[in-house]
């Protein structure tokens, strides 16, 4: 059962607190590291690695010790196979991010708007300070585009400032 219907478009969902699920995920992580020699993983929507029933973003982002435990366990499984592998999570639960960052986990930080503003040549809102948070470990990986955020080049051509809009060599 999916405990957070808002974000999952199928009734099927892994129960990450199940020992069988954890063994399955860890076995697959090991296989990918050993077979393909990849340098790490980015986990999408780790906020959803919970079995708590939630009704909204605040509930879903609330601290969930079981979720933290599962994510640490997956991180440790990766590090046991390849010590220098990078683990990045799209999490969006501030308190848990602080806890998990002290373990060494990195977090996906949406900087799409800032990147687009900068690429278009607009100083307003092209601030990248969201990548730096002095109140917790600096474990952010800022991204310009992803499967959720896109169209930076399109915006540059459509809304760019001066020559950035029309002259490819200026971009």
Where are the model-predicted features located?
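A solvent-exposed, charged loop/short amphipathic helix patch at secondary-structure junctions
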Residues: 155-169
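Surface-exposed loop/turn and secondary-structure junction residues enriched for glycine/proline
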Residues: 17, 143-146, 155
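A structural motif
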Residues: 37-38
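Short conserved micro-motifs at the rims of enzyme active sites and ligand-binding pockets
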Residues: 29, 99-100, 153-156
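Active-site-proximal helices and loops of the catalytic beta/alpha 8
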Residues: 5, 45-149, 165-169
């Amino acid at each position: 059962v999916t405990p957070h219907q808002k974000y999952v478009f199928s009734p099927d969902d892994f129960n990450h607190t199940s020992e069988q699920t954890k063994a399955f995920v860890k076995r697959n992580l090991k296989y990918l590291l050993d077979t393909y020699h990849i340098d790490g993983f980015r986990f999408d929507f780790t906020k959803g690695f919970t079995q708590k029933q939630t009704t909204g973003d605040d509930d879903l982002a609330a601290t969930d010790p079981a979720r933290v435990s599962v994510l640490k366990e997956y991180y440790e499984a990766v590090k046991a196979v390849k010590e220098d592998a990078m683990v990045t999570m799209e999490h969006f639960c501030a308190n848990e991010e602080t806890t998990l960052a002290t373990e060494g986990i990195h977090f996906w930080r949406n900087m799409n708007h800032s990147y687009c503003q900068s690429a278009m040549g607009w100083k307003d809102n092209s601030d990248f300070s969201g990548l730096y948070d002095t109140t917790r470990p600096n474990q952010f990986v800022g991204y310009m585009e992803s499967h959720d955020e896109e169209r930076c080049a399109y915006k540059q051509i459509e809304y760019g400032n001066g020559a950035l809009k029309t002259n490819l060599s200026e971009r």
